[in-house]
């Protein structure tokens, strides 16, 4: 916790000053954690023989989670919440089919309103909740989930502000509930194979790593009817830097055994290129009065961050949400 209070704030300050943003508030002393509670890093929740699972958000991402969890023995899908009833029903039918009449028999549906998920938490009382919504809702939904008595599993990123991250930590400690960010790349077969090689000493001394999140995502600007992806566009106007570092950085941190006693992140510098790609895409594909042509895109087309660890090892983390070619229509 002391590491989070000191080094994470200083690393953000050191790296993000390169963007000309005022982060002086990070330099002020602040009692982030007020619980004086037990550290949750080594906490093991009591075993649950049949885990009652609920889902908030079952669009392109959440629907996949619903099917995967429903297929695991020892789970019982008890509720699904989404803004749109047809999406909720699609996952409902998929889970029922996977249950084959033996499991997932009583799935409650909560749809049609932005706060139906709160009603779900209050009425169903699940053991675990999987959250796959837009970024801004991740933290408040995770916090309310833990307060309701359930463990929270949250899509990337877990939160978008330092204050929300600390509220998640405090709530987890107070409620004794897990809150896990579902950084799936940490658990990919290729990544786990390489991690195993690192731990067996096959790779040798690990001195430098390069990680990246490189996608063409401008096509999501077209998903306006239901906002399934277009909500990202606003973040490119209000945020700067690497908005999605953990896909690449998570596995690398494991390879280097960071945050586990041997070594840790020490300092960071971060620079972004000018932001031109989304502006040009908007001008080409939408009329001049369209909302996408009214945004001041500030998130650079390419961000490069360099991290140095306590032992002097280095990591380069690259990020872009556009490519020279489009990978989807």
Where in the sequence are the language-model features?
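Short, small/polar residue-rich loop motifs at catalytic or cofactor-binding pockets
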Residues: 301
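Short, mixed charged/polar active-site loops
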Residues: 314-316
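Conserved small/polar residues in nucleotide/adenosyl-binding loops
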Residues: 320-329
């Amino acid at each position: 916790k002391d590491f989070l209070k000191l080094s994470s704030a200083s690393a953000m300050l050191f790296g993000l000053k390169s963007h000309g943003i005022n982060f002086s508030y990070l330099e002020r002393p602040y009692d982030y954690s007020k619980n004086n509670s037990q550290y949750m890093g080594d906490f093991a929740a009591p075993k649950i023989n049949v885990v009652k699972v609920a889902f908030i958000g079952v669009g392109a991402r959440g629907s996949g989670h619903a099917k995967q969890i429903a297929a695991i023995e020892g789970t019982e899908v008890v509720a699904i919440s989404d803004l749109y009833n047809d999406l909720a029903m699609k996952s409902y039918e998929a889970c029922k089919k996977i249950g084959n009449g033996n499991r997932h028999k009583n799935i409650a549906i909560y749809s049609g309103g932005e706060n139906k998920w709160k009603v779900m938490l209050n009425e169903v009382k699940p053991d675990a909740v999987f959250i796959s919504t837009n970024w801004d809702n991740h933290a408040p939904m995770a916090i309310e989930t833990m307060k309701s008595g359930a463990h929270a599993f949250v899509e990337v990123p877990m939160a978008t502000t330092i204050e929300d991250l600390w509220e998640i930590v405090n709530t987890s400690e107070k409620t004794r509930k897990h809150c896990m960010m579902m950084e799936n790349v940490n658990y990919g077969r290729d990544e786990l194979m390489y991690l195993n090689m690192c731990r067996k000493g096959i790779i040798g001394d690990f001195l430098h790593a390069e990680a990246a999140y490189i996608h063409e995502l401008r096509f999501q600007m077209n998903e306006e009817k239901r906002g399934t992806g277009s909500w990202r566009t606003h973040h490119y106007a209000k945020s700067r830097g690497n908005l999605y570092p953990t896909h690449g950085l998570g596995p690398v941190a494991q390879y280097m055994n960071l945050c586990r006693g041997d070594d840790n992140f020490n300092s960071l510098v971060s620079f972004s290129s000018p932001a031109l790609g989304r502006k040009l895409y908007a001008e080409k594909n939408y009329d001049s009065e369209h909302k996408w042509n009214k945004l001041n895109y500030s998130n650079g087309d390419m961000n490069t961050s360099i991290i140095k660890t306590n032992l002097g090892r280095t990591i380069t983390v690259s990020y872009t949400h556009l490519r020279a070619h489009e990978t989807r229509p």
